[in-house]
Amino acid sequence: SYAAQRIIVTRVLIALNVFVFLWTLVGSGALDQRQFDLGLSLPFIANGEWYRIISSGFLHFGLLHVGMNMLLLWQLGQLLEPVLGEWKFGLLYFASMFGGAAGALLLTPNGLTGGASGAVFGLMAAAAVGLQQRGVNPLRTGIGATLILNLLITFAIPGISIGGHVGGAITGAVVGYAMLEPRWTRTS
């Protein structure tokens, strides 16, 4: 369909995430050196390794981790990218990723964090906000249920980055609100 052809940014993001995941598999051990070199942790940021804010957003610690994030990215990308356009969708994704990184650094500054979950939570929250702005209760849609289920999983399973998920969701909700419902209209 036309909408499926227009999800270029979504496809590129999925390809990058899968590439980085496969690249980290080339190493050995439970936590290989490549994962360690890309992960987010405040001591590394304080040491000037700012690239980790971006690299950690493409790093995944297992097949289930990358698989779930890419499944949600694919579904949310099909919904949001045709509505927002490529540039705004990319901006929403990366703003949410940065929000997730900030949340992770605030709550677990010395932990090693990675994954696209912050960005994906931002996309879920933006979609929920967009539905609400249009008079659709997001809790009566798959988006609302998916967001709630993922938040429950976030708080129920140890080792999941609560700060990353919540930081991404808050950022996505705010940026999504601004993008999906302009508060100012032009008058001539």
Regions found by a protein language model. Give the residues of each.
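A detector for small-residue-rich transmembrane helices and their helix-helix packing motifs
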Residues: S1-S188
